Amino acid sequence: MPRMPDSSSLFDELQDLATEQQNPHSTHIDTASVEEILRVINTEDHKVPIAVRRELPHIAEAVEIVVEAFEADGRLFYVGAGTSGRLGVVDASECPPTFGTDPERVQGIIAGGREAVFRSQEGAEDVPERGAQALKGQGVTENDVVCGIASSGRTPFVVGAVEHARDAIGCPTLFVTTIPREELDVDPDVAICPVVGPEVIMGSTRMKSGTAQKLVLNMITTAAMVRLGKVYENMMVDLRRTSEKLVERGIRTVMMVTGVDYDAADAVLTRCDGHVKTALVMILADVEVDEARRRLDATDGFVRPAIEGDE
């Protein structure tokens, strides 16, 4: 079994982390009223989007890397532990119903495996080699992208995965953390570092750090999917109609974009197996199913040029 780090050196390392500092604005919350506790949390939460905004140039770099990988049939792997790992799993699991992607396209890997999504697996994050093994288990190749997520920037499972991806696999690497960039030990292709400051509860990185990570992951996958033609105007047009809500959303989308009524939208969607993009092209370009599909194939799934016949 790999040797664990010396406890005294780990103590020294942790006490200096930005995520482990005491927040001077919340030291009184153990004696505060409920409303004051909430006010303190809300005030601190307002700092999160500002910190994320400062990282937009780096997030844009990450999006370009992900888009390039997707265009080459590559995949995106989020790797995290605890809250960070769960956030990766959540973002990955939402891509298929939202954007119609294959579940393999964006995947979340969490230290401790599936059980850790629902219940903390203490110690699962402490061995770097396990991160590397997790990537091997998923068959990660140089065509994929590995994105580590760790509030502290030092979680061994995550660092081990990112270093293995960079050095052994040779694929692009990203890292999302909430410590200053200069304190990051790992060297990814792109580091995204929204520094949100000490947590309201010292060290509870499920709070501001987790919120910042969720915003960043939302941006990465959403912007990438927009660039891949998964959105028309600001609407989901590649959604999978896997629930009653999504069936109705598909009909409503066709109605809103084309101006047809409910029955007409439903009828066209029935003719094209419920595919919203095809329905839009059929109605707006006044073509039949086969021609609409041909146009979408010719434009790599982008609706606007398919409607205009700009192939």
UniProtKB/Swiss-Prot annotation:
InterPro entries in UniProt: Etherase_MurQ (IPR005488), Glucokinase_regulatory_CS (IPR005486), MURQ/GCKR (IPR040190), Reg_chr_condens (IPR000408), SIS_dom (IPR001347), SIS_dom_sf (IPR046348)
Catalytic residue positions: 94, 125
Keyword Chaperone tagged: no
UniProt keyword list: Carbohydrate metabolism, Lyase
CDD domains linked: SIS_Etherase
EC number: 4.2.1.126
Catalytic activity field: N-acetyl-D-muramate 6-phosphate + H2O = N-acetyl-D-glucosamine 6-phosphate + (R)-lactate
Residues in SIS domain copies: 66-230
One Gene Ontology term of the molecular function aspect: carbon-oxygen lyase activity
Enzyme class: lyase
Keyword Lyase annotated: yes
Pathway membership, UniProt: Amino-sugar metabolism; N-acetylmuramate degradation
A GO BP annotation: N-acetylmuramic acid catabolic process
Cited function: Specifically catalyzes the cleavage of the D-lactyl ether substituent of MurNAc 6-phosphate, producing GlcNAc 6-phosphate and D-lactate.
Subunit structure: Homodimer.
Miscellaneous comment as given in the Swiss-Prot or TrEMBL entry: A lyase-type mechanism (elimination/hydration) is suggested for the cleavage of the lactyl ether bond of MurNAc 6-phosphate, with the formation of an alpha,beta-unsaturated aldehyde intermediate with (E)-stereochemistry, followed by the syn addition of water to give product.
Family to which the UniProt record says this protein belongs: Belongs to the GCKR-like family. MurNAc-6-P etherase subfamily.
The protein's name: N-acetylmuramic acid 6-phosphate etherase
Gene: murQ
